[in-house]
């Protein structure tokens, strides 16, 4: 399975959070799966960590290093991803999450998330 990881899934994996479900852990450990992180997630962490480091315990640099060391591929934001956001129904107002939904949909990826507002976007969203 090819999966785009929601930002919080990567952060929880990095810090060993108990919030990461056993299903998510199992999927992350399955070597048959290929994982991607959006450059929008790195941007989100850079913004939110500088504003609220107590809530976002990792830096963008740490997240990049973790992804590279873990074999998680970078998914850059492309023009078509940005355009696809405009056609999404308004299930969620968070611009970072909307970008991840658009990217997953455009690239034919599953989106692994623990955000309850994302599953209404379609079956490609896997709530873990």
Residue ranges and their predicted role:
Residues 36, 75, 126:
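General small-molecule cofactor/ligand-binding pocket signal
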Residues 7-8, 45, 85, 104:
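Generic structural signal for small/hydrophobic residues in well-ordered secondary structure
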Residues 44, 65, 83-84, 120-121:
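Short secondary-structure capping/turn micro-motifs that flank functional sites
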Residues 1-37, 50-65, 107, 116-120:
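Short, well-structured N-terminal submotif of metal-dependent ribonuclease cores
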Residues 9, 41-42, 81, 100, ...:
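Alpha-helix capping/helix-boundary segments
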